[in-house]
């Protein structure tokens, strides 16, 4: 009997002294559960909340001071006098970073990425962002083809305004053959001149793929030449602090058009791939043709290219009544097809860290709603891509353009007028980096074009089809 009484007294004392748990739930002030919130009792940490915001907390029969904190939220302290019945909710107020991103001239920068601790978002058309759950400290602001920047945020409620600058690339064109022959000379050229970028042919107008691609279509049509290791070139460019732009010719592709005619623009009169002046085009409305170009773009981005510059991202400009496309060739079809391709490229490449550029005919900067029959309209292209590169070669303008009988004789005024037209018609704040003529000109004429571009605050790329760069037009370092 005595032993029974002692055991009963011990059991009762033990039960009374044992901590009894209850369930705490941590919520955001929007009502959403907060995972990984830190919980402490009387300054001693007891654990972190689960995915549903809950955590089991022991109750020790006395008032406790509960501390709860979570990234991106204002910490909260709660005194609990009695054991809660059921769920005990603690609501944390989310910190909100309100900001605006502008360029050095104060113009809003759309689609800039803002990262503040666990919170990420992008700016709207006015350059503004309201970032819920932001963490005080270093905030990173970036946008493809722009120079990333950081600023310190103290968690305050005012609007933070931060400037971000476009990357001003100064590049020359390197063909696949030139890279195979002597790619070193271009790195040496960059080391001794003002160049800070290289434009390297990945796939050119021949349809040949010059890097070590593993894309199955490139292999199937015999396009892969692999004259350079792209990952090694990218690593070398990064070490030399050079911005690497990869030129990818999309739809002008005689290699794939002839060997995979199901992807090609067809001539209904012959039922063969359509060709004009030696050019064969893949059909921009054909899903497989689009997928080929996008697949190569993703591959080169993974290999270290900073920017993919899509060239010949258009319909063929010389067509007859027998030229046929899977999806038709109306104005609406042409423009929506090209913009759709570029939008898909942005969606695929931005998460991989690559900028998206597009080469466009020079006339598009002044063409208004006319797409020239190729699907390129300046306002629409600049509304999608990170970098728009009009080919403002004076030799490509016919008599009468901007009042000149022979536009090629007036490199400075021609480039000036073309860029003025383009800048007046931008649909948003986007990097404009023109292709400049580096063929048939003296060093002084090439330099004149460079100076015009720089007066607009732009970078530039020199085009020479054989990479015979006019080095004397470049400033020496």
Segments predicted by a language model, with ranges:
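A short, solvent-exposed loop/turn motif at the edges and junctions
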Residues: 65-79, 140-152
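Substrate-binding cleft of secreted/luminal carbohydrate-active enzymes
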Residues: 385-399, 411-477
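Structural motif
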Residues: 24-35, 98-111
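Extracellular beta-sheet/turn segments enriched in Thr/Pro/Gly and aliphatic residues
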Residues: 12-16, 76-94, 152-168
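Short, acidic Ser/Thr/Gly-rich low-complexity loop/linker segments typical of extracellular
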Residues: 33, 44-56, 80, 108-110, ...
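Catalytic domains of carbohydrate-active enzymes, especially glycoside hydrolases
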Residues: 184-207, 302-307, 384-387, 456-460
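Active-site-adjacent "subsite" loops/lids of carbohydrate-active enzymes
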Residues: 167-181, 246, 251-299
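Aromatic-lined carbohydrate-recognition surfaces of secreted/lumenal glycan-active proteins
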Residues: 243-253, 309, 334-375, 429-441
């Amino acid at each position: 009997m005595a032993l029974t009484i002692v055991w009963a007294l011990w059991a009762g004392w033990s039960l009374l002294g044992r901590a009894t748990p209850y369930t705490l739930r941590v919520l955001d002030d929007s009502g959403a559960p907060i995972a990984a919130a830190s919980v402490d009792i009387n300054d001693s940490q007891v654990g972190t909340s689960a995915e549903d915001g809950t955590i089991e907390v022991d109750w020790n029969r006395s008032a406790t001071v509960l501390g709860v904190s979570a990234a991106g939220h204002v910490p909260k302290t709660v005194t609990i006098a009695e054991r809660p019945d059921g769920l005990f909710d603690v609501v944390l107020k989310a910190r909100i970073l309100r900001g605006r991103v502008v360029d050095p001239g104060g113009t809003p920068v759309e689609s800039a990425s803002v990262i503040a601790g666990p919170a990420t978002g992008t700016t709207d058309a006015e350059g503004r962002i309201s970032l819920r759950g932001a963490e005080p400290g270093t905030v990173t602001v970036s946008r493809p083809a722009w120079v990333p920047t950081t600023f310190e945020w103290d968690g305050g409620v005012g609007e933070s305004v931060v400037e971000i600058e476009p990357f001003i690339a100064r590049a020359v064109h390197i063909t696949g053959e030139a890279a195979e022959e002597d790619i070193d000379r271009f790195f040496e050229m960059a080391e001794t001149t003002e160049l800070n970028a290289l434009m390297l042919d990945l796939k050119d107008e021949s349809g040949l793929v010059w890097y070590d691609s593993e894309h199955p279509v490139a292999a199937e049509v015999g396009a892969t030449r692999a004259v350079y290791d792209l990952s090694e070139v990218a690593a070398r460019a990064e070490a030399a602090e050079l911005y690497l732009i990869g030129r990818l010719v999309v739809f002008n592709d005689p290699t794939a058009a002839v060997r995979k005619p199901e992807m090609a623009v067809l001539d209904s009169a012959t039922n063969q791939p359509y060709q004009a002046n030696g050019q064969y085009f893949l059909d921009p409305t054909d899903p497989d043709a689009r997928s080929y170009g996008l697949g190569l773009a993703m591959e080169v981005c993974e290999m270290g290219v900073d920017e993919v510059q899509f060239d010949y991202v258009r319909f063929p400009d010389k067509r007859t009544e027998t030229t046929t496309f899977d999806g038709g060739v109306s104005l609406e079809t042409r423009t929506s097809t090209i913009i759709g391709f570029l939008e898909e490229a942005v969606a695929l490449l931005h998460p991989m860290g690559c900028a998206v550029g597009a080469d466009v005919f020079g006339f598009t900067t002044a063409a208004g709603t006319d797409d020239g029959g190729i699907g390129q309209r300046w306002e629409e292209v600049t509304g999608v891509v990170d970098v728009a590169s009009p080919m403002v070669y004076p030799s490509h303008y016919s008599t009468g353009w901007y009042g000149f009988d022979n536009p090629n004789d007036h490199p400075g005024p021609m480039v000036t007028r073309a860029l003025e037209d383009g800048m007046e018609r931008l649909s948003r704040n986007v990097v404009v980096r023109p292709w400049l003529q580096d063929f048939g000109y003296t060093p002084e004429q090439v330099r004149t074009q460079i100076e015009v571009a720089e007066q607009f605050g732009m970078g530039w790329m020199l085009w020479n089809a054989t990479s015979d760069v006019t080095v004397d037009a470049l400033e020496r370092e």
